[in-house]
Every structure is written in C-alpha cells, then in structure tokens.
C-alpha cells in the first residue's frame, strides 16, 4: 500500500492547476524516489512533468512502484478547501484508487475524499536529452507579462542569447516587440555557454508562462533549435517542468 503526506496542500493545488492547463487526466506515479506525473500532448509540442522528490514528503510509505490514473478535477475539489499555508495533504492507496485527506495543522480541521483511479505500471515517458547552452532564472510574473506582450503582436517568438543578453522578439504586420533580459535586469542568474537561437509558438509559451506565477525562481533553458525547458519550483519542494518543442 501507499501513503504520502506533503506539507503544503496549497502548493499541491497550484501544481495540479498547472497540469490542468495541459490535460485533465494524469497518471500519478509512486516510486522509491518521488511522486511524479508526465504528460505529452498529442501534437508532441508540449511536455509537462509534475514531481515531488521523496525528501520533501513528510511521510512516505510504498510497498512497490505503482501508477494510478486519476482525474485532476476530482483531486482539486478537496484541495481547493486548503485556504491556509498550514494545510497538509495526504494520499493513501485504496482498492478503488486514492483517499485524499486535507488537514489544517493549526485548527485540526480535516476533509476527506475518495477518488476512483485505475492502477497501472509506471509510465515510461522520458524527458528530451539535449544540451541547454543558455539558462536564466527570473520571477514567474515577469515571464507572464512578457508572454502577454508578445501575444499582442505575433504568433512566433524568437529567443536568442549572445554575450550578456537574452532577447525575445516577434514581428508581424509591420509591428515589432522586443524584450531584453540581462543579469539583475531583471534576471537573477544568467549563463550563456554559446550564442543560441530558437523559435517557439507564442500561444504555447503564453499558456506555460501563466503557470510560472506560482514561483519567484523560474529557470528557463534553451539552445539552437532545441526544446525549451522551464522549471517552476515551489517553496515546499514540489515542481513543474515544461518542455516546449521549437518551430523549425
């Protein structure tokens, strides 16, 4: 049997909300090292990964690795009741799926829900193996604002890096938008191994960057015409990772 307790029901809710932008059904994989879920869109343009490493789980018991397919909306119904930072969430395997308990550690109030789930093997989807020659970290709100501005002008964004600057630009119907990102203006970190350039869908980027607002330390990586990687961590240890395929 499986039992896992995560310290922040609110963060768990935020992470699942990010997944819900891509799919409403996931396989929660329980392994010795972590709880995770991976999903690739049918067009193979976007992959999203939800992960909570074992070290960030307050209580984790697992007899054997197992996947449980669930509907995210069913899980969000109870997680939406977590109004304070002191609320924890516990997942317990049942014969029919999962028992989910949200408990406010300050007040002692508790809510339970039983979710139907199909038990499966661990999914074998793997992340792209590419060399990200450019990485930078910034506040998720900044990325959301940039994506919004890009979407007002064009459908594709070219992201490039050279020397000490990352540039996001789009041009369409005589209109141009360009955003220049540098260390401390507003980047918290910047590493450029070599000049790089790639083009991505603004619509996909906008959807992903809406999710980044849950974190103040979002790390973006890209290279020459390879998938972009966006890592969105939470203070409680859980994270979302997005991979966006380039337009070639």
From Swiss-Prot:
Keywords: DNA replication, DNA-binding. It comes from the Archaea. Signal peptide: none annotated. Disulfide bonds: none annotated. Belongs to the PCNA family. Sliding clamp subunit that acts as a moving platform for DNA processing. Responsible for tethering the catalytic subunit of DNA polymerase and other proteins to DNA during high-speed replication. Homotrimer. The subunits circularize to form a toroid; DNA passes through its center. Replication factor C (RFC) is required to load the toroid on the DNA. This is DNA polymerase sliding clamp 2. The gene is pcn2.
